[in-house]
């Protein structure tokens, strides 16, 4: 994919993300009838991305004009988010779970980790509950960051900045993206285990860990974590949300044991002041 345009790469990645929930069907075979509603838009996005890579016009990232290059990066990120929202809405709409506008609303809320929902979770199948949580988890990372983790190009930094990431953990951008992703995965595993230890079922634990880390707010329960009436579960949720809202550079300092240096960061001080 080295010579592929960044828009094409991102379209392919979004398609794969939409297909990903199909992997849980081995655990919930009763939802197999919904598989086509994820595979169809996902594969079409992958195909469209492949066509853009093969025949599309390369972005003008090699202009000597820095402003022009940054403008193209901004346009690519803007296009990617609109594409992600449109493709992400399709499983809800094609399956008849939601009307078209409602599907777009749910997709926007999921990818942007806003947390507002129009779905009745008490009547929703497992695959859609997982999909909503997975959208928030991926949205918390950002499409561009995930792409940079897999492939890097000469203008990856422009795209990275255009999506609004302040974290520069490593000298190399790809290493930065991989470090953030690894931390995000580790926190997800730890959060899921913590929920299970506190008495939450495994499926709900995974979904709530994804939504808490992204500070998104989706839930598999009508009353969210209040459904469990458990102080330990609420404490785990608070900790995960604090982790999710903290700069990854600060988290890396804490992981490396540089506590004093971390608490000198103004962002951390202000956070504790608010708490």
Regions found by a protein language model. Give the residues of each.
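Membrane-proximal intracellular helices of multi-pass ion channels
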Residues: 1-275
